[in-house]
Swiss-Prot record:
UniProt topological domain (Periplasmic) ranges: 272-282
Gene name tied to this protein: zntB
Protein name per the record: Zinc transport protein ZntB
UniProt similarity note: Belongs to the CorA metal ion transporter (MIT) (TC 1.A.35) family.
A GO molecular-function descriptor: magnesium ion binding
Gene Ontology cellular component terms for the protein in this record: plasma membrane
Coiled-coil intervals, chain numbering: none
Membrane-topology descriptor: Multi-pass membrane protein
Length: 315
């Protein structure tokens, strides 16, 4: 059975790994399977799992959700951070869990670090002792990996500088947070629905499951807070950029206003209709330059008195 990654028996106080072929689903057993393997569908259907449930369990795309079935059976679809090598963490992996006839069946396409750690703990006889504890640890393991990734986002946010006008890091962090939020928000509702279903797995460990729900709620609130931080940084950068643009525009306008009268006078002299005034005088150019300087000075004093120059100094 190539689709069976691991098979554990939780019917005894210490979980034991099964190495024999699992033709039939047994209560208190955990079957961790490869979702894309061609034989898994026939195995599920041979064990009387409804075809609609099988289709949903093996679907290519799915969002986090909880689906109650008959006789205390249910399906829980979760998402986790992809922490595999060369993977983009925000491309979240999917863990599909089916509780059917007292057995827990989990399927995956991409290996999950959280599941791998649980399997390692079981191999070292340090893992969960029951299916209820196993499911809770899967949920909390996924929560923990999301928390670790959000720590890296927080470090990125702490490095933001409002004086740095480059928005590449801001946009990258914003995209990552939005990608995670897309799945984590419905995951919070899925875990809430699991708790409210009062399944025997949940009722045996109610406090642990509520703690897991509190954690995913806190994670969602953290994501919302970080998105607000990114938006605030972007607003501050835009504000600083607008202020700089306004200051430069004001300065150019002030300079143009100062030169406007002198430009008019020099242009008037350049018309040369009826001859240029002062051509016969050797001091004409000197007196004209002195007049321009006086005009510059008077304009500057006028602008200073009106407070126009103080505005550029303050900015």
């Amino acid at each position: 059975m190539g689709f069976m990654i691991e098979h554990w028996d939780f019917s005894t106080p210490m979980a034991t790994q099964e190495t024999t072929t699992a033709e039939h689903i047994q209560p208190n057993h955990w079957y961790h399977c490869e979702r894309l393997h061609p034989d898994i569908r026939s195995w599920l259907e041979d064990n009387h799992v409804p075809r609609a449930t099988v289709d949903h369990l093996l679907a290519d795309e799915s969002r986090p959700s909880f689906h109650p079935l008959d006789d205390d059976n249910f399906m829980l679809i979760l998402r986790g951070i992809n922490m595999n090598e060369n993977a983009s963490p925000e491309d979240m992996l999917s863990i599909r869990i089916l509780y059917f006839q007292g057995a827990l069946i989990s399927t995956r396409k991409i290996p999950s670090r959280a599941i791998m750690e649980i399997r390692q703990a079981l191999a070292e006889h340090k893992g969960p002792k029951s299916l209820a504890s196993l499911l809770n640890q899967i949920i909390e393991g996924l929560n923990g990996k999301i928390d670790l990734y959000l720590d890296t986002i927080e470090e990125t946010l702490n490095e933001f500088d409002v004086n740095d006008e480059s928005t590449y890091n801001h946009i990258a962090a914003q995209k990552a947070l939005i990608s995670i939020k897309r799945f984590i928000r419905p995951q919070q509702y899925a875990i809430r629905d699991l708790i409210e279903s009062e399944s025997e797995l949940v009722t045996s460990r109610p406090h642990q499951y509520r703690f897991a729900h509190n954690n995913i709620t806190r994670i969602n609130e953290t994501i919302e807070f970080y998105l607000g931080e990114v938006a605030l940084f972007q607003d501050e950068i835009k504000h600083n950029r607008d202020e700089k643009t306004n200051k430069n525009s004001y300065l150019f306008t002030l300079v143009a206003t100062i030169f406007l009268p002198t430009s008019f006078l020099t242009g008037l002299l350049g018309i040369n209709i009826g001859g240029m005034p002062g051509v016969e005088s050797s001091m004409a150019f000197t007196w004209f330059c002195i007049a321009l300087i006086v005009i510059f000075g008077l304009e500057w004093l006028l602008f200073k008195r009106l407070g126009f120059t103080n505005k550029t100094d303050d900015e």
